[in-house]
Design a protein with these regions (language model features):
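Metalloprotease/metallohydrolase-associated module, dominated by Zn2+-dependent proteases
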Residues: 26, 111-137, 153-185
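Metzincin-family zinc-dependent endopeptidase catalytic domain
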Residues: 52-142, 149
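Short glycine-rich loop/turn motifs that provide flexible caps or phosphate-binding loops at active sites
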Residues: 9, 146, 150
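A structural signal for well-ordered alpha-helical scaffolds and beta->alpha junctions
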Residues: 50-57, 172-176
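A generic secondary-structure signal for well-formed alpha-helical elements
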Residues: 15, 150-154
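N-terminal secretory signal peptides that target proteins for export/translocation
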Residues: 1-2
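Disordered inhibitory propeptide/activation segment of secreted metzincin zinc metalloprotease zymogens
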Residues: 5-11, 18-50
Length: 185
């Protein structure tokens, strides 16, 4: 009987110690895109010629895990859900996503706060200071800012708060899954 208890205890310890738990969880903003994520239009402003935006839009739509995200490019910014521009921002900031209501009033700026209410559209500004940086060329900054426009807050993976990474971080399952929790499908 004593050997049986030791054997069972040994198995229990082996299971507990041999099991890894993924503690990473993507997080969301209190407010999200009010029009949902199935049929989002975007526009590239004339200054947003770098950042690999079109490719990064596709990287969010077509993941190995599937999602109902559908984003299409539009020739102007009338009624779009996400607009892309570039401007000079402070050093260390690769891009900023600002959030607006249906009356074109800014309700939150990515520089200082997250949207606390649902927003009608988002405006992404790339920092011209980093137009030649590897994180801009490989699309990491665009991918990160698109995540914000979809309602995802800073966490790990592609949503880590950093412009200095040279790693081409992909859209991961945690960030794909949070879209399901936010918008449902």
């Amino acid at each position: 009987m004593k050997k049986m208890k030791l054997l069972i205890s040994g198995f229990f310890v082996a299971i507990v110690l041999g099991t890894s738990v993924d503690t990473f969880a993507a997080s969301r903003f209190p407010g999200v895109l009010s029009r949902g994520i199935n049929g989002i239009s975007y526009w590239l402003g004339p200054t947003a010629t770098f950042g690999n935006t079109d490719t990064e839009i596709r990287n969010w739509m077509y993941t190995p895990w599937g999602n109902p995200l559908y984003i299409y490019k539009q020739g102007n910014n009338y009624g779009t859900s996400i607009d892309f521009y570039s401007t000079k921002l402070n050093p260390g900031i690769g891009g900023v996503t600002d959030f607006f209501d249906g009356r074109d009033r800014m309700i939150a700026t990515g520089m200082r706060e997250a949207p606390r209410i649902n927003y009608y559209y988002a405006k992404i500004n790339y920092n011209t200071m980093y137009s030649r940086a590897s994180s801009m060329k490989n699309g990491t900054i665009a991918r990160h800012e698109i995540g914000h426009a979809l309602g995802i807050a800073h966490s790990n993976g592609i949503m880590i708060r950093s412009v200095s990474t040279n790693t081409n971080l992909a859209v991961d399952k945690a960030n794909n899954d949070i879209l399901a929790r936010i918008y449902g499908w």
